[in-house]
Amino acid sequence: MLGQMMTQPLLISSLIDHAARYHGQTEIVSVETDGTVTRTNWGEIAANARRMGSALTKLGLQPQDRIGTLAWNNRRHLEIYYAASGAGFVCHTINPRLFPEQLVYIINHAQDRVLFFDATFLPLVAAIRDQLTEVKHFVLMGPRNEDALQQIPGLEFYDELIETGDTDFEWPVFDENTASSLCYTSGTTGHPKGVLYSHRSTVLHSFASNTRDVIGYSAMDVVMPVVPMFHVNAWGSPYGCAMSGAQMVLPGPDLHGEALVNLIDTYGVTLAMGVPTIWQGLLAHAAKCGTKLESLERTVIGGAACPPSMIATFREKYGVDTVHAWGMSEMSPLGTANIPLAKHRKLPIEEQHKLRENQGRPPFGVELKIVDDDGNDLPHDGVTQGDLMVRGHWVLDSYFQLKDQELLQDGWFATGDVATLDPDGYMTIRDRSKDIIKSGGEWISSVELENIAVAHPKLATAAVIGVPHPKWDERPLLVAVKAEGEDPSEAELLEFFDGKIAKWQVPDKVVFVDALPLNATGKVLKRKLRDEFKDALTG
């Protein structure tokens, strides 16, 4: 016997319709590529998305055709999010900071039919357009620009294309398992791989994100996603904010500390989201200019392990709660979020603070386990380390156009992380499988060493890598960036590890660099560091 309840498909178009209907006047602030600020609202975003959805349909596209974007966090990009998916196409957000050869591969592999791009990327698109064999429409995200038209003959313009759309366009209704959006992971070996999300997985992910024990967007919030919209759908924030009716501040291309501090203080941002490297710049500028960040209530930090010193600075200096989270493209990306349990209120304050340093617990919809090298389940005791496995409602089962390749292990996806799980489900990432340092048969966590190093007041940032050693196979090397105006010695930095870890885990050497190589989302490119310093202990 079946239940007698209504059945309605979980579609992304329903999110923007909800935002328009019940939060239509809620403001969206957008920093454009030229630095100007546009103030709009959910009602206008929804109306424009509907018109653009109609305009795309009139181009003669087929259902499920891919719509590519090379764009920053701005209002037009937000409109495309809903226009493409809502009209039955697939919104393919592309990382513009990849090498041109990688971009050509990704756009052709995805078979994008339309490519929207911000003015910032006009020279890039002009240089590779002849290699983009599947793209039929190149669209500059802005008004008509004659100079751009000279560079790309036949170029179309967002502000003109949207005028061809109907204001009364009706969103099509289809199976909720229909593909909605596409992101490519930057593979460490071989070509990047596509992760194809569905309407169902995206809406369920939004429900989970909106719970109080995860991110908990609210109509009372002013949300600034600093994580790019080309990176795993900006962690789902455009969908979660529409579902909750939160205000949004879209920061555009300038993600330096000064620009972000100004946006927080000017528009009363209450919740901001980004990777640790972004917050390092923000905290440095906040300290320099003396702001109190009075409106900011919480930050969500993911993408890489968050140093405990950063959590402490946010808490102690600015009264900001930090939600340490973890996920990956293959998980839409939400996997865990660190929110304390009721029983933790009774813990001494120092233990409460220590608890907030791990990556947190999974929400309903995600399951975690750890296994040994033979695939055997390991205990959730908070001590035993193993390979982290996941499954859930918004976890992939195969990569785009690679459905025939066996990916899952007994229904579980191998994340490539080494982790521990405690009895309450709190997960701690010990390292990436490829980054953990194997020295004399023992494992050394590069993350643990980095957390200690970046707490040194004379360092701006640091990374730890394993490099070849003639006796121990591998040993840790500290790659450090000095703080402005500081000149720490190698001995001074190595002494900083005393009493914090076992002596045999202390890095063998320190090398100083002007900056760490980062990818587009702020993650350190450790493979590049390993290549550069592979002879540091043997040469």
Swiss-Prot record:
GO-annotated molecular function: ATP binding; ligase activity; metal ion binding
Site residues, Plays an important role in catalysis: K523
EC assignment: 6.2.1.44
Superkingdom of the organism of origin: Bacteria
Keyword entries, A-Z: ATP-binding, Fatty acid metabolism, Ligase, Lipid metabolism, Magnesium, Metal-binding, Nucleotide-binding
Effect of substituting P333A: Retains 69% of wild-type activity
Cofactor list: Mg(2+)
Record annotation: effect of changing K438A: Retains 5.6% of wild-type activity
Regulation: ADP acts as a competitive inhibitor and inhibits the ligase activity.
Record field: pH dependence: Optimum pH is 8.0-9.0.
Binding site for ATP: H231, G303, H324, A325, S329, Q359, D417, R432, K523
Family: Belongs to the ATP-dependent AMP-binding enzyme family.
Protein name in UniProt: 3-methylmercaptopropionyl-CoA ligase
